[in-house]
Design a protein with these regions (language model features):
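ABC transporter nucleotide-binding domains
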Residues: 13-186, 191-205, 211
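ABC-family P-loop ATPase nucleotide-binding domain
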Residues: 1-12
């Protein structure tokens, strides 16, 4: 039986008395691609933030790779990759400079040059991040999430802004990484993407799981 990479029990988070995540429980096994789905405002991003410990949940328990997300954040940081839609980067920073900055944070980083080649942005290393197209920037953010050489990666709206061909290229790379043992926790709006990649899904509506 595979170990649990993520275990969430009765997670609850509210703002001004309104529940954004309401009594959510889920389990993600090691080596699995898990999809968290829902409309904007359903509680997907807040769920990820509570799992990572960057937001304090009101109640509930969370275990990530056997760690307590808040107490063991430094250890967890070395084993988890996170990709979000946009980052707060210096305006003129170049792709290679940003990759080098991220690389320095980790003990056993992956080869970011190889990752950039694999994701089709190997010829953009000297370009300013802000000069990249939306699709190129999206692929860069996935590369940044993989630089830690993580056991678990969180991918938020994985292929937003990519054309059909680029999306399928990303899917293939993730399938290869999954075969190597990577666990993926992703959010997506695309049902074809979910069908192609996910082993299990949870659908949120107003913070509550309506399908799991």
């Amino acid at each position: 039986m595979r170990e649990e990479a993520i275990k969430v029990t009765n997670l609850r988070k509210s703002y001004n008395g309104k529940a954004v995540v309401d009594n959510l429980s889920l389990s993600v096994k090691t080596g699995m691609v898990f999809g968290l789905l829902g409309a904007n405002g359903a509680g997907k991003s807040t769920t990820i933030e509570c799992i990572l410990g960057t937001k304090q949940a009101d109640s509930g328990e969370v275990s990530v790779l056997g760690y307590h997300a808040k107490k063991d954040r430094r250890k967890l940081f070395q084993e988890v990759g996170v990709q979000f839609q946009e980052g707060d980067y210096q305006p003129e920073i170049k792709v290679f400079e940003l990759c080098e900055e991220i690389e320095c944070l980790y003990k056993n980083p992956a080869d970011w040059r190889q990752l950039c080649e694999r994701f089709g942005i190997g010829d953009k290393l000297k370009n300013a991040v802000k000069s990249l197209s939306g699709g190129e920037r999206q692929r860069l953010f996935i590369v940044l999430a993989l630089i830690p050489n993580p056991k678990l990666v969180f991918l938020d709206e994985l292929t937003t802004g990519l054309d059909a061909r680029a999306r399928r290229t990303v899917w293939k790379i993730l399938e290869d990484l999954k075969k190597q043992g990577l666990t993926v926790f992703m959010t997506s709006h695309f049902m074809d993407e979910v069908e192609a990649l996910c082993d299990e899904i949870c659908i949120l509506k107003k913070g509550e799981p309506v399908f799991y």
